[in-house]
Amino acid sequence: MTDKRPPARNARSGYRRTLPWRVVTGVSEFLDRRIGWDKLPVPLGLGTLLGLRVKLRQENLHDTNRIPAVNVPEPAPGNGRSYLVNRTADGSYNDLDQPRMGMAGTRFGRNIPLEQIPPVSAADVLSSPNPRVVSRELLTREEFIPAETVNSLVAAWLQFMVRDWFSHGTSPAERPWTVPLRDDDPWPERPMQIMRTPDDPTRDPQEAPAGTPDTRVNVSSHWWDASQVYGSSEEEQRALRTGENGKLRLWGDDGTPFPSDPDRDPSRVPGFWLGLAMMQTLFAKEHNAICDHLHTQYPGWDDEELFQRARLVNAALLAKIHTVEWTPAVISHPTTVTALRTNWWGLAGERAHNLFGRISNSEVISGIPGAETDHYSVPYTLTEEFVAVYRMHPLVRDDWHLRAAADDSTLREATLRDLAGPEVLKVMDTIPMHDLLYSFGTLHPGLVTLHNFPKFLQEFERPDGHLQDLAATDILRSRELGVPRYNEFRRLLRLKPAASFEELTDNRDWAEQIKRVYGGDIEKVDLTVGLYAEKLPAGFAFSDTAFRIFILMASRRLNSDRFFTEYYTPEVYSKAGLRWIDENTMGTVLLRHHPDLRAALAGVKNAFSPWNVAGRE
């Protein structure tokens, strides 16, 4: 099928363009430039972030579907009109007027104007400077730099979320990028090869106007729908379900932890490691617990009804945990903690929500869940810039001290290599899950900064035997996908670019290193390097520049999804389902399935903060 829809309206079409809102956005940008939102008192900082978000919604949402497409995916609802009240497997029919919006197989959008994305050449991707040189000289971890305010479940959770949000798909073996290597480079292959991102199968080269930027598709659903637990197709979903009481299969149910079909073995998928396996197991169990609860409340519901309602509840619980627990843990500035809680409960707060429910239609007063659906005049998708700023591999440790929750005794000293791929199965067979979770909860992750990239991931052997330097790959990917370099990225977000290497970072040694690698040209500094180098706001584990994309996209994932907005109702979720979301946190989920963690979590307000170490006063 060919898609030649008329161009979508830009966000600039009128969203909050009245004089009072122009004053709000103008004052917000002035205060941010002159003082910084993070240095303002919390109430003024919140107002500034509100104004910045309005401006980002006006200027930084851009629809790649304006470029003509062919062979676009077809929405295929399953049972009659069940898609009206259930999430479809592929994400179609979330928007009832544009059923293809956000479904698996549709294009990534952009947070920068399409006309600002120049055509990408091989020289752009492979030189100025070589991605491998950037990896070795600026990203290599010499000594682990911890993020001391959080625990390593932060890293596991992020990858768990990423598996839901986006994937460019399996790279083709043909035409790899060939990266030349220096004579002293220990890489065992000459030259280094990095597989290309798959082309956009919906691209129509004859109809696309000359000079339009490359596009790519998301093989996952763009929606926050827990597709990493439930799959992105009817076929995947059927394979995961037991067919009884709405429940999912758990690893080990039939004596085998994974499907016998090697093509469906998740341990053979690149990027699979213990942290991801633990989160997938935990929330498959949570789905089944929700099914049990709903079955007691509504005994007449059949397998299909229980599954669909539990999926809605589980997906919303994941979104809530990410919004009010994970993100405040990694950006624990008082202003951002309040802002994130406001996204979910509004300024009225959690207590008012629990007592009275929504007291206003405004998302600012009563939060986004239950408010009106709003795409801000641009069809919803995740974006290539969102993908780029979520490249946070430094969160992952290289060395793991696995210990018992009961007494903190050593069970195993392991490296990341021991906890990745098929090796995960051996670990899960020999160490109880509560001890693995305890170990993660009492170990710090890495800080997202220069010289802190996991060594194992710089010499990563994929399940297919292909060697990969993920640090070099991260640099190359942003270039390949047309994501601007650091200074231009900041300009397009209306932020001041770095005038010098010393202005980019307050670390003098880093400034000299970056200057040397980039030949003294500040404009060439890659986005990832700039994000990792800049000074962090108080309480942040990642950069303020990346945070600007989160200001925009974190709320958009909720605002655009009718199952978080107009359909976030007792009629769709059930009263018991909404209560489950309200009453649960990451901590209650952990304790429901692993009560042996009670002492470790005692007094811990946020399960992503460091846990209690057994035997320590």
Each predicted region: which residue ranges?
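Folded extracytoplasmic luminal domains of secretory or organellar precursors
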Residues: 480, 495, 503-504
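Alpha-helix capping/termination and helix-coil
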Residues: 493-497, 518
